[in-house]
């Protein structure tokens, strides 16, 4: 038996030896492979770091540390040459692109949320996932990078499924920028380029069709999101999947990139399809910062369920390039079973361009572009305003001769979704709007030209309200029914109105500007003293400023009222003397 055991061991020992040698060889081979992998990973990491450094040298080399930090105004002692570069960049983009390159894309922002917003907790495991859709056309690289950087650093990673970046036919496409975005933001950004510009609405639809998350968040390409912006924005959609939400839109100044607090408001449009903002209703103001109803959204920044957006048909496919899309989608939401809420606990800064900058959305001439926008207006009016479109057409008669295209698909959608009539919208969301912008306008206190008595050949003129200041110009031949630019009315709301623009004072009553009528009195309150012929701003009786002609400059200013100052004397084309006697009835004076 011992001999058998010995023979068995003699057979097994060589086998064990071979197995040991094999294990050693395998171990050494594995070590070699791991070393090669480590070298490869190190090489890849080094190459990635090198690429980032090279591209940072292109896009971030001019950054000045702490410039514009915490959203403070970015200022410096610029040379004459630099000031010329600043002016050039503002002419080309409508904002200080030169300065933007010198502000870090990762700059900090002050937390402007209401204190109660900071205490709110959200069920993160239940909140829906989000696809952020950003479209752009020839956007300044530093501005776009700041938008993306703020998203990456201030958005919970577990909620952000993707950022879909749609280049809408930029003529200044930059492959290095695309590479930098791909490397810097890794898998966060999905980049899609459309070779020929299709416009805001269609580019957004392209992005929405690529999206995979439960909720779509549409943002402009020149924004900065703030701390805690996303959770409150999407929480109402968790409660009701037919809710669309909008954040408070803070302002980023075009000239120094200062981040300024925006106010809660309710969006609307007037009877010339200008977007306007109305104050919160009393009960909404008391409930702040709770979400409140928003009749018409601004359109640039909003969140909506992906399936609900699809069910609504997205944007009307007949709308071209830009214009009226926020009216169309807002009306469709409210009238077809949804709602829009503004969420004060969510704040996003928006870079607003210089008011004098004329944005071009196409390569077409200016008149062709205006026709496209007018066509959009008419399509929205024909589908959604019902009989109230006549009020719009009375103020915008040129719309009636604009070809509107085929409306069958939109009418079918309206019927299929059992959408309510526009009257429901007015009755339920617009009671204060109708007081400010009635279907039938009440009698005016005075109207026609506003003629300078000291320079009787000159009248107040608003030829180009986008420039922000009125001027003096030769009077129209008809003083009662002059040209639209010289037709002013002292309205039932004590405004000095021309069309949908009002005269207002700024800088403690010194400067006179033209701005969209806001219906809140204040700096747009005016009265007329028929005895002294003075046009007086404000409701204060003890410290009054009057409109004053500056004929040598073809301008107007405001200064302390002086009955002996002939430059402060004016004459309306028509004066309703009997109605003017009751001007101060029911007006609170200070």
Swiss-Prot record:
Entry remark concerning the domains of this protein: There are two conserved domains in the glycosyltransferase region: the N-terminal domain (domain A, also called GT1 motif), which is probably involved in manganese coordination and substrate binding and the C-terminal domain (domain B, also called Gal/GalNAc-T motif), which is probably involved in catalytic reaction and UDP-Gal binding.
Spans within the Cytoplasmic topological domain: 1-11
Membrane-spanning parts: 12-31
Residues engaged in binding Mn(2+): 220, 222, 350
Pathways per UniProt: Protein modification; protein glycosylation
Family of the protein in this entry: Belongs to the glycosyltransferase 2 family. GalNAc-T subfamily.
Lineage, opening ranks: Eukaryota, Metazoa, Ecdysozoa, Arthropoda, Hexapoda
Residues carrying a glycan: 77, 241
The entry's keywords: Disulfide bond, Glycoprotein, Glycosyltransferase, Golgi apparatus, Lectin, Manganese, Membrane, Metal-binding, Signal-anchor, Transferase, Transmembrane, Transmembrane helix
Species this protein is from: Drosophila melanogaster
Name of the featured protein: Polypeptide N-acetylgalactosaminyltransferase 8
Required cofactor names: Mn(2+)
PROSITE patterns in alphabetical order: RICIN_B_LECTIN
Subcellular location: Golgi apparatus membrane
GO biological process: protein O-linked glycosylation
Disulfide bonds: 117-345, 336-419, 459-475, 502-517, 546-561
Renumbered residue ranges of the record's region Catalytic subdomain B: 291-353
Catalytic activity: L-seryl-[protein] + UDP-N-acetyl-alpha-D-galactosamine = a 3-O-[N-acetyl-alpha-D-galactosaminyl]-L-seryl-[protein] + UDP + H(+); L-threonyl-[protein] + UDP-N-acetyl-alpha-D-galactosamine = a 3-O-[N-acetyl-alpha-D-galactosaminyl]-L-threonyl-[protein] + UDP + H(+)
Tissue expression profile of the protein: Expressed in developing oocytes and egg chambers. During embryonic stages 9-11, expressed in the primordium of the foregut, midgut and hindgut. During embryonic stages 12-13, expressed in the posterior midgut and hindgut. During embryonic stages 14-15, expression continues in the hindgut. No expression detected during embryonic stages 16-17 or in third instar larvae imaginal disks.
Metal-binding in keyword set: yes
CDD domains on file: beta-trefoil_Ricin_Pgant8-like (cd23461), pp-GalNAc-T (cd02510)
Stretches assigned to the Lumenal side: 32-590
Function according to Swiss-Prot or TrEMBL: Catalyzes the initial reaction in O-linked oligosaccharide biosynthesis, the transfer of an N-acetyl-D-galactosamine residue to a serine or threonine residue on the protein receptor. It can both act as a peptide transferase that transfers GalNAc onto unmodified peptide substrates, and as a glycopeptide transferase that requires the prior addition of a GalNAc on a peptide before adding additional GalNAc moieties. Prefers both EA2 and the diglycosylated Muc5AC-3/13 as substrates, albeit at very low levels fro Muc5AC-3/13.
Membrane disposition: Single-pass type II membrane protein
Region (Catalytic subdomain A): 127-236
